[in-house]
Design a protein with these regions (language model features):
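Short, small-residue-biased leader/transition segments that mark boundaries at the very start
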Residues: 3-8
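Divalent-cation-assisted or electrostatically stabilized phosphate/pyrophosphate-binding catalytic cores
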Residues: 28-38, 69-86, 97, 101-112, ...
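A structural feature that tracks compact, well-ordered secondary-structure segments
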Residues: 41-65, 92-96, 104-108, 115-122, ...
């Protein structure tokens, strides 16, 4: 099932890239239109990677729920972190659709909270392992999940940065056109 989903995502990514290339070749867009097409080609990769990370998390969860107990503080923190990362994706996609630079800046700023959560949970897990080395597998599973969540947040930031590019022609404060 996971392999099939990955194939579908990869196929959709290639289709979007193909359509963008066809637009570039046939229409020879300039200025804003060129930035929009370039952004679509870049953003599709981030969206595909978000899907890959979500798939990786889904693969870990069935085992994780057997080794971590309900009410586990690290799991509760990870769930809160996941909600923040999810909101970043939602906000980044809304900013992209509306070409809203202010909304994009808010997504970029929100990444600090996800990064903070990642480091806090990682520290908690390190303490857990130090206190009881037998818990290393359960801690590593959760560590993988939070790393994927952190990367999802980073991909949402990338999408937001491309929104800024559409609006300004600048990517990460560097003029591209």
């Amino acid at each position: 099932r996971r392999q099939r989903q990955m194939c579908i995502r990869d196929s959709m990514e290639r289709d979007i890239e193909h359509r963008c290339m066809a637009l570039l070749l046939r229409q020879q867009p300039v200025a804003g239109d060129l930035r929009r097409i370039s952004t679509a080609m870049k953003v599709v990769t981030d969206i595909e990677r978000i899907g890959d990370h979500a798939s990786d998390i889904a693969e870990i969860i069935p085992h994780l729920v057997t080794v971590r107990k309900e009410g586990d503080p690290a799991v509760s923190q990870a769930i809160a972190m996941g909600r923040k990362a999810y909101q970043m994706i939602q906000d980044a996609m809304a900013a992209l659709t509306a070409e809203d630079e202010l909304a994009a800046r808010k997504v970029i700023a929100a990444d600090d909270a996800v990064d903070f959560d990642f480091n806090a949970i990682k520290h908690t897990l390190a303490q857990e392992i130090a206190a009881d080395p037998a818990k290393v597998d359960a801690a590593l599973d959760l560590l993988m999940v939070i790393k994927y969540l952190e990367r999802i947040g980073d991909h949402a930031v990338n999408v937001a940065e491309w929104v800024q590019f559409v609006r300004t022609g600048r990517y990460k404060d560097e003029s591209m056109f």
